[in-house]
């Protein structure tokens, strides 16, 4: 089968953020089965923050992720199940455990300027026989030249593909294009792109990335992902078909999956709320939204103020504990102002 673009469906990983990591085995089986039947080549399954992400810091999973991964693997006849691993959260032991369950892909994620911490994890994933991707998160925080330098490191460690990851949904189309061009000029492995829709630019950025040569593309069915979600897979498939770009994925089956199976899972409609918009505007990690909203309720303040301050401080993924600290500081300032 010819695929001009390789689609990885991320709803069962990135979408975990949107539902507070409450996926059940039954939901994963139903979604993964439908994705496999639609001929999606890669399906990512894990806690939203990757292997071993279930914690007070990032959010506790309702169901142990290994059970979810095993369930997905058991129903996939052609698709490879993938996992995300952030060094420092997940370990090589976690990677080996996932591989033993039958996963076929590992994506090793670091901050955009910290590719060096991925070396042993990429090497181990390759040793385990997994399709291995480097995942450069918060890509808006690194200039194209810096991002290219980091991508070359991941390639040198053995990555089969390197992704530009717009974790905050902050990139504008020209910025997305610049970054893809920079990687295409210096890599011999394929370039991937992962978008978030916080500024309503996920589709535009993804199409620009494809036009600049990215061939591994992430989508999330029904837009189920952190913040305002990702590039909506079924919509992307329709657009690419109109453009004459082959994905090998069945559009009608993906539409049915979105409408009949994934839509009922959503706790609220996936839309660009004011907080999701501020994520993209301020350049804040998309999974911070629900954490900031909880902190705002606790301290009686505006969640947008928290997110704007986090953006000003350039807080990155893994610093979720800063959200409560910032909220407390803002609440103290509010209180001091009222006293005066």
Swiss-Prot record:
Residues 5-255 form the Pyruvate carboxyltransferase domain. Mn(2+) binds at residues 14, 194, 196. GO terms for biological process: catabolic process; L-leucine biosynthetic process. The keyword Transcription does not apply. It comes from Brevibacillus brevis (strain 47 / JCM 6285 / NBRC 100599). It catalyses: (S)-4-hydroxy-2-oxopentanoate = acetaldehyde + pyruvate. Pfam families: DmpG_comm (PF07836), HMGL-like (PF00682). This is 4-hydroxy-2-oxovalerate aldolase. Belongs to the 4-hydroxy-2-oxovalerate aldolase family. One of its GO terms (molecular function) is 2-isopropylmalate synthase activity. It comes from the Bacteria. Gene3D superfamilies: 1.10.8.60, Aldolase class I. Substrate binds at residues 13-14, 167, 194, 285.
